[in-house]
Amino acid sequence: METNFKSGFLSIIGRPNVGKSTFMNKVIGQKIAIMSDKAQTTRNKIQGVFTTNDAQMIFIDTPGIHKPKHRLGDFMVQIAEDTLNEVDSILFMINADEGYGRGDQYIIDLLQKVNSPVFLIINKIDLIHPDQLLPLIEKYKSLYDFEEIIPISALEGNNVDHLVDVLKEHLPEGPQYYPEDQVTDHPERFVISELIREKVLHLTKEEVPHSIAVVIENIEKNENEKLLIQATIVTERSSQKGILIGKQGTMLKNIGKQARRDIEALLGSKVYLELWIKVKKDWRNRQNQLHEFGFRSDEY
């Protein structure tokens, strides 16, 4: 390893649905953090690893900051706050088309307590007129002393390469923590469950999305060398179970079809996906079930 190899951990933080997962997936080049047009889709810290010949960045994608409504919400916000004290740099991401809000001030107040450099990332610049950008920059400049302010469009890829170069410049010298071909530190089961959950979020509406968890029950190869994946979608109410199954099972088939496509792309092999639905009342407020479904923390 060269003596000037750089590496570091970077936290991506912001209000719900500002495009944090979209940005990380664009940088890494694979879908490892789920994306949805519904807020609060990211639950566990997801580490995306980006490696070049002279640097390695480990991105931590946190739940969006929001006012919690239940113990799962408390858990999500606690993860986001904890990461501020664990990382080498912080990326505070905002939506260009939403402007300054109370949720942003809450995050800025949190940032006053940290020593790591903070970069303001203004995302979704493709949704505003260029004349709207400068007033937004001036507003945030008056609120906090950011290391740099960088406008991007994570979805379109605009200015993302420049942002990565800037972040690389600020990395400390350090070891290569992960092999160069590794893009996440999460096991396959976790990423597969996230891909299934993404399809539920995308295809269902109203109260169903944030009332669901996905548990991978079994992964094995069958006699035809096809990967058999069995998973359970857990929801809180029987009425939600009906929505997830759909008329004559059409919704569940749709979820399975779309999830299978992404899982096959991830694993590079043919997949047979079996999905079941289970009702676990009020699971988001039950510590033992949060633990069972993969939310491992003393801060539920």
UniProtKB/Swiss-Prot annotation:
GO terms for molecular function: GTP binding; GTPase activity; ribosomal small subunit binding; small ribosomal subunit rRNA binding. CDD domains: Era, KH-II_Era. Residues 40-44 are annotated as: G2. Residues 152-154 are annotated as: G5. One of its GO terms (biological process) is ribosomal small subunit assembly. Residues 123-126 are annotated as: G4. Residues 61-64 are annotated as: G3. It is a peripheral membrane protein. It comes from the Bacteria. Gene3D superfamilies: 3.30.300.20, P-loop containing nucleotide triphosphate hydrolases. Residues 14-21 are annotated as: G1. Its main location: cytoplasm. Pfam families: KH_2 (PF07650), MMR_HSR1 (PF01926). GO terms for cellular component: cytosol; plasma membrane. HAMAP family: GTPase_Era (MF_00367). Monomer. NCBIfam families: era, PRK00089.1, small_GTP. An essential GTPase that binds both GDP and GTP, with rapid nucleotide exchange. Plays a role in 16S rRNA processing and 30S ribosomal subunit biogenesis and possibly also in cell cycle regulation and energy metabolism. Belongs to the TRAFAC class TrmE-Era-EngA-EngB-Septin-like GTPase superfamily. Era GTPase family. This is GTPase Era.
